[in-house]
């Protein structure tokens, strides 16, 4: 579906959010298991609408089969009760819809229809007027649907059943209002969804609306979710562009992969992981590797900068936690730093330690770019906030590899800390295009190299110009 996006919406009922649900899924042939964030990312990337429950899938199908496309992700919420409107607005917001203030001209027109006590900013509150004068329902819907900044309208309340709480004469007026509402909705060609507590009952008004394919829901939340589904369907991704940024030398790449440590797991230690990234055109900061106090002195002199110096050994996956990293080391102190790290290595059984030294990076936003192979979806790329607390913060997003620039930019916008990438508190914006370039190249690496099971680049300092990779490692698949 990434290569050939469907012109028709696709809904998949995918349960399994709980551990017990995943266990049950695994007990059936052909069950689709997998880490839920990866499933959600894959479906979103392919334009698939995911439903966690059968009723949710049914509600989505009704909306998509009945409604015209939602051209804007903005809705007006009309209600004959403030509580109803609040729930609809909250649910709409949580599912990616905006409920913006209506244009001044739209509000003026609404004030001409509704009593002074009514709210007209969005949501619109009838304040009891519709139960006395049902004709206001199609008139207000007409005004809201005519607003060019509004994509669709959700009505929440008791419409369709006013006859049950009033006189038969009011019921006849409500039926006439329903027929007028049908004409209004058809005339504007925008989605209109009705929430009513009487949904499912055999009432004349509701039968009129059903005959006109206006979807009706008894649940406030379902009404808002149904409109959100229309927006997701309208925002389906286009085909993956397929253009590459990287042109790696495969002979060089194979030589780098051959440096993996023996045993299980097979590790590509930081120097080789950096070389692998460089082979894919990633801008890797200059570094040197040394194995003695003498060689580190020469290497430090070449770099002409204060240094980060790190032990390189398969036993040290998390070097900082093991005391295997020294920061902000003056070049003339490099030999002392080596001896300190060598003593630390000896204390944990590493006899002939190597160290990597690279210029310090003391500024920039710490991010992470990672990748792994999902058993269901294949290579997956991750981006988010990085650093030593990356797992605790868990502000990350995922995409299937390979991906293009548009998909990579979308990843940046999905993390909770997205605003930190822009200008913030007097600080210049980060170079997001450099982050996009890194994400795309990593995705191409993962799509090319089946041998690479995991790749962890953390932290990646996102600078005002460019990126600076501070650490990298890879795990290769077992042979």
Model-derived features with residue positions:
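Catalytic-core regions of core metabolic enzymes
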Residues: 1-479
